[in-house]
Amino acid sequence: MATGRLGVGETLQALNAAVGPGSPVWFKETHARHLRVRDFLAPRSALQARFRDGQVPECVFRAVSCLQGPGVAPVLRCAPTPAGLSLQLQRPAVFEHVLGALASYATPAKPASPGPRVILHCPALRCNPDTLRLSQLRAVLVADHLVRVLRAHGVRVCTVPPVRDPHMSTFLQKLRVEWPSASKNTSTETLRTCVLAKFNVSKEETLPPGVLGRLCLKELVEQRHAAGYDPSIDHCLVTEDLLSVLSELQEAARHWPEDGHPAPVGGPDAGVDDCVVIHVVSCEEAFQQQKLDLLWQKVDDQVPHRQKHLVCGPVKVAGVPGTQMTAPEYHRLRHAQVCKASAQKHGGDLAQDPAWTETFDILSVATIKFEMLSTAPQGQLLLAHSTISTKGTKSGTFVMYNCARLATLFEGYKHGMEQGLYPTFPLVSSLDFSLLHDEGEWLLLFNSVLPFLDLLSQTVSLASTPGLHIPVRTEMVCKFLVQLSMDFSSYYNRVHILGEPRPHLFGQMFARLQLLRAVREVFHTGLAMLGLPPLSHI
């Protein structure tokens, strides 16, 4: 029997516990062909490794068939098959449980108590936008996505640096990246005094212009060898710019902005133990960022104990030699291509139509974000130049298009209701979800609505892990939304949702609409994690 919010993870944990101690043997099915006959499978090979001759004891069958507990989905049947031990859920009960509590499956729950504080540092935002490289743009978009996901889960995030270049602020607005701005630089006087006291410059040494002094970092690197710092780091040339960067990080760590939570006990300098610094950098900035990390440790005895680095891989454009294309040029290219593709589809010059201006702006940003974020951030990214990625099923435009189709569907129901064709939407508790027996309906619920929040929570882990780099999977949301769009598009093209206005058809229509309400909420939450508003038309 299910209690509380159902979860794939909770169900798998209970299934594996029912089999007994040892390695996990169950996995969730995802392919439509397999979901026609089962929802979970314990493969024959895994059972043979666990039990003699692969014969599952009767007590295990009974335990699996009577499975229950917090978050565990209700079981219909469990039976041996040539593939292994096959399990199917009570699907109408799962539909009812999930679709009767949409918010708990589409919106992350905030923790009862505040979790760790995160300082998210993106050095690329100190650049002039006209010189911003594509690899730096990738780091900016990854950082913005991480901020949104962490805050959605109730994590207190402080972003560094505040943007001081008004042109950068304007460019970020075009990209729908939310990042604070500031007009004044942070004072470096106190830090300067501290750092100058640590300089050990010989009289014979001549420093380069603009360099205040040299600090040796070799000892720190050797002490933290296991953490993964570059062993070639020897020293750091300290400049005013470097002090300014360090001062911004110090300010963020020591004087946490108001966020509605009480300050750490012990004053503004307390709480470094619960603070995590995440440096999101391009591959070109990674070496210098390690130096800054070590410099902070050397000159500040109140430096946060955990500094993690996320290094974004290089970005190349097919047909463009080297890395000559800048981020603004890339944005203009994609915007022009979106306008051209829409003009070919709808006819006329819609780019000059004020009603379409915002739509094209959103579509071009969606195209960019899905291109930049659909690949694991650490890997190399190759972008197309002459051909736009707005066509096909793996583009941001495809996702936005299907989100708009959902909006059109519900607008169509509303219009039909106003005309008296359809009754008002009944209470969800009165709906008969046993009428949802199309395989596409279960695919949408089981592969998308049910596991969505679990997937979202796996984007980044703040658990204390060894090493310099933080495990993140910022590609997961984009890939999930693309797959959801493909499943929804297939279902929508095949099934007529708004049927004829006949009373005996309303039950199935409302059950389907409630399912698609859940799909719509998942779409909206997923797009919000990317800073993209849903469109009502394309």
Curated annotation (Swiss-Prot):
* Superkingdom of the source species: Eukaryota
Q: Name one Pfam family in it.
A: DALR_1
From the Swiss-Prot or TrEMBL record, give the protein name. DALR anticodon-binding domain-containing protein 3
Q: Which Gene3D superfamilies match?
A: Isoleucyl-tRNA Synthetase, Domain 1 (1.10.730.10)
Biological processes, Gene Ontology terms: arginyl-tRNA aminoacylation; tRNA C3-cytosine methylation
**Designated gene of the protein:** Dalrd3
Which InterPro entries does this entry report, sorted A to Z? DALR_anticod-bd, DALRD3, tRNAsynth_Ia_anticodon-bd
Under the GO molecular function aspect, what terms does this record hold?
arginine-tRNA ligase activity; ATP binding; tRNA binding
* Quaternary structure, from the entry: Part of a complex containing tRNA(Arg) and METTL2. Interacts with tRNA(Arg)(CCU) and tRNA(Arg)(UCU). Interacts with METTL2.
Q: What does this protein do?
A: Involved in tRNA methylation. Facilitates the recognition and targeting of tRNA(Arg)(CCU) and tRNA(Arg)(UCU) substrates for N(3)-methylcytidine modification by METTL2.
